[in-house]
């Protein structure tokens, strides 16, 4: 199966698994996906993830997080897509729900949250937003 948007596929897998109340989900591994999951873990949106190798293929096993039976992530949405890339300078990085959520950016200094990008004074491609 050919996936045209691998990051969007992972975000959809997370969204679908949380709607079903699952504790874990899997996604094919890549460096970008792992860096996005690092940000989600650091910000407290998921419990963590592990890279597992099965029959020569690496997959990411993502542990989802719930609070009082409800998913911690109420919205996870792709912003920059393969057909329409969205870039933002440091002064134009969007606030998600007046600062209650985060944007995840791919910058020249790596993948990071919007708050980290503002602190390091760098802009970049807005990959997704999480609330």
UniProtKB/Swiss-Prot annotation:
GO terms for cellular component: ribonucleoprotein complex; ribosome. Keywords: Ribonucleoprotein, Ribosomal protein, RNA-binding, rRNA-binding. Transmembrane segments: none annotated. GO terms for biological process: translation. It comes from the Bacteria. Belongs to the universal ribosomal protein uS8 family. One of the primary rRNA binding proteins, it binds directly to 16S rRNA central domain where it helps coordinate assembly of the platform of the 30S subunit. PANTHER family: 40S RIBOSOMAL PROTEIN S15A. HAMAP family: Ribosomal_uS8_B. Part of the 30S ribosomal subunit. Contacts proteins S5 and S12. This is Small ribosomal subunit protein uS8. The gene is rpsH.
